[in-house]
From Swiss-Prot:
It comes from the Eukaryota. Its main location: plastid. InterPro entries: Ribosomal_bL32, Ribosomal_zn-bd. GO terms for cellular component: large ribosomal subunit; plastid. Keywords: Plastid, Ribonucleoprotein, Ribosomal protein. The keyword Electron transport does not apply. Belongs to the bacterial ribosomal protein bL32 family. The lineage of its organism: Eukaryota, Discoba, Euglenozoa, Euglenida, Spirocuta. It is found in: Plastid. Pfam families: Ribosomal_L32p. One of its GO terms (molecular function) is structural constituent of ribosome. One of its GO terms (biological process) is translation. This is Large ribosomal subunit protein bL32c. SUPFAM superfamilies: Zn-binding ribosomal proteins (SSF57829).
Length: 50
């Protein structure tokens, strides 16, 4: 028989959301940095398949 889940506390859900957002921001910063380096022609640090 199905049992309802326990309610997650606000602090726990907020900490999970902030952890997720921190990971997303890190990936966004990496993507922006990679895009800038590719647009300015600094390809020495990256290997691209042609």
């Amino acid at each position: 028989m199905a049992v309802p889940k326990k309610k997650m506390s606000h602090s726990k859900s907020n900490s999970r959301k902030s952890n997720w957002k921190r990971k997303v921001i890190k990936k966004i910063n990496f993507a922006v940095t990679l895009g800038k380096s590719l647009s300015f022609g600094k390809l020495s640090k990256f290997y691209l398949d042609d």
